[in-house]
Amino acid sequence: MNEMFKDCYSLTSLDLSNFDINNLQTMNDIFSGCFQLRSINLPNFKKNQLTQLDNIFQNCKSLISLDLSNFNTSKVGSMRCMFSGCSSLISLNLSSFNTSSVQLMGNLFTGCSSLVSLDLSNLNTQKVNNMDNLFKDCSSLTSIDLSNFLTDSTKSINNIFYGCSNLSYIDISSFSFNYMSNPSIFDKNIPSVGTIVVKDENVENKIKNKITHWKFQYKNISSNI
């Protein structure tokens, strides 16, 4: 089913509720480029064998909401660009996602410029080694809590908050940046004032050059820079 509906520009709705996907391993790009798609009735994903979901909704620019409650992602190792370019999505509920096997998560939400709410508290990032551009150009997000994100295996986390021009609160208190001496996670468009929660002074020293006017907090202890 890879690329099955890719670039079907005129599609506005799809009902796939009767599709049997139990034996599928990949669904890459299945809806990618369906610019006018506003409604998708997805098949039941609870018993699938999927290992890749790359670009599945990429550039579905007209989607406002998605029901992902039936997604079984327990075997998925890659979900790169899964929602990239979904510029009309306002919120996403990923509470049913099991990401314990995911290694590649780069560009997952890139260009989701209308997202105002994103609960990632259930995501398991223990095996993720690439988070590049994860929230790039999510310009409507004002706060983001990644306190549950484990980054001990993460070797690349570049540009994670690039273009997040309205962020004023970030919690990355679980981030260690073990493999990076000077991580580039912010750009010049980051707001001039905000609060960021980090693990310790070592992490602060690695990232503070790009957000020199922000207030840093170590866990529950605040310190101004």
Predicted regions and their residues:
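Long, ordered, amphipathic alpha-helical scaffolds
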Residues: 187-188
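Residues marking helix boundaries in flexible regions
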Residues: 22, 31, 41, 57, ...
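Low-complexity/repetitive intrinsically disordered segments
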Residues: 1-10
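Register-specific detector for alpha-helical tandem repeat solenoids, activating on a conserved position
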Residues: 2-3, 25-29, 54-55, 77-81, ...
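Structural signature of tandem-repeat unit edges
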Residues: 9-25, 35-51, 62-77, 88-103, ...
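Predominantly recognizes leucine-rich repeat
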Residues: 6, 32-33, 58-59, 84-85, ...
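Extracellular/surface-exposed low-complexity segments
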Residues: 191-225
